[in-house]
Each structure stands twice: as C-alpha cells, then as structure tokens.
UniProtKB/Swiss-Prot annotation:
This is Large ribosomal subunit protein uL29m. One of its GO terms (biological process) is mitochondrial translation. The gene is MRPL4. GO terms for cellular component: mitochondrial large ribosomal subunit. Keywords: Mitochondrion, Ribonucleoprotein, Ribosomal protein, Transit peptide. It comes from Candida glabrata (strain ATCC 2001 / BCRC 20586 / JCM 3761 / NBRC 0622 / NRRL Y-65 / CBS 138). Its main location: mitochondrion.
Length: 315
C-alpha cells in the first residue's frame, strides 16, 4: 500500500541566503601609511570652556505690547494690599440700566481684565508667599457682583425686546405707524447726512423684517420679501429728487417697487447716487424684457438670488 508523504528533495532544493559559498579571504594585506591619531584630528584647540551664564531678568527683553502684560497691573509683579482699592463698591442695577450697550460692553471687559489680574496675584499670595489674606479675593468678589448685574440688565433688555417684538407682530396698525414715522424721518434728512440715514435704514430693516447685513444669516419668508420691497422703495425715494432716471422708475410703478427682482437689484446696490442710478438702468432692462417675478414665485426666487450671491462672495 502506498502512503502519501512529502518529497524529501525539497529540502535539498531550498534556497539559502547565499546560493554560492562566499570565498574565504586568504590574503590579508596590511594597510600602508596609517595616520596616527593626533590632537588636531580629535578636537580643535580653539574651543574654550566658558563659565555658565547665570539666569537673570536682564537677559530677557519683553516688548511693551506683549499680550501677557494684560495680566499685570502697571507691569508690577504683584501689588501690595495697601495699593488695592478697598473703598470701592459694586455697580447697582439701577445705575447699570441707564448705561448704553457700548458702555456695558466696555465695563464688562474692564471687570474681566481686573479679575484676571487679581486671580494671578491671589495665586502668588497663597502659593509663593504662603499668606492667607483675602484682600484680593474680596475685591474680586465685588467685581463679580458687578458682572452678574450687567448680565441681569442685559437679560431684562432682551426679554423686553422679545415681548415688544411679539406685540408688534400682532398689531398691524402699530406696524404701519412705525413705518410711516421712520419713512418721514429717513427722507427728511439732508443729503449731507446720507451715511447716517442709511445706518438708520440698516437698523430698521433688521429690527422690523429680520434683514441682516450678513447674507448667510437671512431667513427668506414673506416678511423678508415684503421688507425687501419696502427697503428698495425707501432707497429710491432717498435719491428721487436728485436724479431723473430714478424719478422715472418710481413714477412708472406708482411710487413704490412691487417686483421682488427689481427690489433685489436696488437692495444689493451701494448706498450712493451713482450705484442706485446703475440699478435703475438694470430695472429698465428687466421691464423691457418683461422679466418680472410673480408673487407665487417670490420666495424660491429670492432664495436662489441669495444663494448665488453667497457663492459669488466666497469665490
């Protein structure tokens, strides 16, 4: 009976690292002209060991505008407790209510900077000086009281704004009165005050219609589209008396812009006479080609306009 076995010849045919034995070097020749080691070949005599430089603050130069100076008071390592203002008090809520948003913003960051300075000094006092005095912590607590009161006042204003906006959205008569009052004030400003007038218009369009200067932040709805038409109309009326072309555009449309495509052209134009005049030339071409936008297509059309505008600005 035959048995299946591995062939024994594979071991003999296996390839080793060297297919041929390496020849032995029988002739070892002695090297001639051997250079003896010298001092020049190992190191240079020009190197000298210098004494170590002791660490000192004189060797470190810090520019005066370095950001970390904000954690120091008058560039002092640490103020003495006698130098601290221990007689001051925290701001009261009635006092903060009389301040503007800019004042509250500045006061908040002033308090934040002072608390950072006090926190560093208190850390040095407790860890480096091994002192348990609470002078720095007491002043920091006063400042913290001012900061939470600032947040309280801002929260009051935010809730008041939200409630006023809800009430305003439900009262059509109140909206019309506000628009009429703003329109009168906006158009009565002198031509030398164009910059101030358009700053007013920017705040007005954001507060009433949610139209933001940042394109990506806008939500296109019916209120947005109606606001777009009103803002374009006010923009043209601002320059109506200064240019015949602008006046003709308004007269053709009964004194206001009703097409959202025309409104978008005026809205995206710069706030100056030349840019608005060029926008009116574009409106003439739209009217000649009868390229109007129906009311049913206004929302998707404006969304497409904004999407293309965002793509153009990001390129």
């Amino acid at each position: 009976m035959l048995r299946r076995q591995f062939h024994s010849g594979c071991v003999q045919l296996a390839r080793t690292r060297y297919t041929k034995p390496k020849p032995k070097n029988t002739e070892t020749r002695a090297k001639e002209q051997i250079r003896l080691p010298t001092q020049q070949t190992h190191h240079s005599n020009e190197l000298r060991i210098q004494p170590p430089i002791p660490p000192s603050t004189k060797n470190i130069v810090v520019p005066d505008d370095h950001p970390l100076w904000q954690f120091f008071s008058d560039k002092k390592f640490m103020r003495r407790p006698e130098d601290l203002d221990t007689t001051s008090r925290a701001w009261s809520i009635p006092e903060l209510r009389r301040k503007s948003f800019e004042d509250l913003h500045s006061l908040w960051y002033t308090c934040l900077k002072e608390r950072n300075i006090l926190a560093r000094e208190n850390h040095l006092l407790k860890n480096a000086a091994k002192n348990n005095r609470n002078d720095y912590e007491d002043i920091s607590e006063k400042i913290r009281t001012t900061m939470w009161r600032i947040r309280h006042v801002l929260s009051e204003r935010d809730w008041a704004f939200k409630r006023a906006r809800e009430t305003f959205a439900q009262n059509k008569e109140l909206q019309d009165n506000l628009v009429d009052d703003f329109k009168k004030e906006f158009l009565e400003l002198d031509s030398s005050e164009d910059e101030q007038a358009f700053e007013m218009l920017t705040r007005f369009q954001e507060a009433l219609f949610g139209i933001h200067e940042v394109i990506e932040d806008n939500v296109v709805d019916r209120k947005f589209v109606d606001g777009l038409k009103l803002v374009a109309t006010l923009k043209l009326q601002r320059f109506q008396s200064r240019n015949d072309s602008i006046n003709a555009i308004l007269e053709e449309s009964d004194g206001q812009i009703n097409d959202v495509g025309e409104a978008f052209v005026v809205f995206t134009a710069d706030n100056n006479l030349k840019a608005v005049e060029e926008a009116c030339d574009a409106i003439k071409e739209l009217r000649q080609g009868e390229n109007g936008v129906s009311r049913f297509d206004e929302l998707p059309t404006v969304r497409g306009y904004l999407k293309r505008l965002v793509s153009a600005t990001t390129v």
